């Protein structure tokens, strides 16, 4: 079976290639959407569970879903994939300015694409790691992670960027507004 870190690296590199094709300024719009998504999910995580706890205390059937890791994994995966789909297929937030030409434009597109891949695939991996019990039961995740994968899990976006997300959101919005 392919190590999870190999799949992660391949997918992040694929996003880098997409970044080259789409261009630096369009990819920055996706970066803004991803940072706002991560900000929302990290703030929503604790509050959503408290809210559901209050709401489901009287409804037994929903209360059984509340503690189910499969439901939480599907919930977060659908939100992350749905937001990414809209970010790439829906209204495109394109930062103002002209696309840099030549090697500079290619490298900027690659860099921002790699960042977007890290944010997207890293966020998915974070929630898969957090709620991995259903995937282990299905045999999708088997055994322990390699040493590299264990190091990568510690630097996934929700954990690594959590203290900086409010500042990153403001910074990215300022970049969008200032021409």
Annotate each language-model stretch with its function.
Residues 1-179:
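Alpha-helical transmembrane segments and their juxtamembrane interface "caps"
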């Amino acid at each position: 079976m392919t190590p999870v870190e190999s799949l992660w690296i391949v997918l992040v590199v694929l996003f880098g290639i997409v970044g080259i094709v789409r261009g630096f300024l369009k990819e920055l719009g996706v970066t803004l959407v991803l940072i706002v998504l991560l900000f929302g999910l990290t703030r929503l995580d604790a509050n959503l569970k408290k809210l559901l706890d209050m709401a489901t205390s009287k409804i037994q059937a929903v209360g059984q879903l509340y503690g189910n890791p499969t439901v939480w994994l599907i919930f977060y995966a659908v939100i992350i994939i749905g937001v990414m789909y809209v970010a790439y297929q829906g209204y495109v937030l394109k930062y103002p300015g002209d696309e840099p030409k030549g090697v500079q434009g290619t490298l900027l597109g690659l860099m921002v694409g790699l960042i977007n891949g890290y944010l997207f695939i890293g966020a998915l991996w974070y929630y898969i790691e957090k709620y991995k019990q259903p995937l282990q039961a299905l045999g999708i995740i088997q055994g322990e992670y390699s040493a590299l994968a264990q190091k990568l899990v510690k630097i996934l976006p929700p954990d690594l960027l959590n203290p900086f997300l409010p500042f990153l959101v403001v910074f990215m919005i300022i970049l969008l507004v200032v021409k």
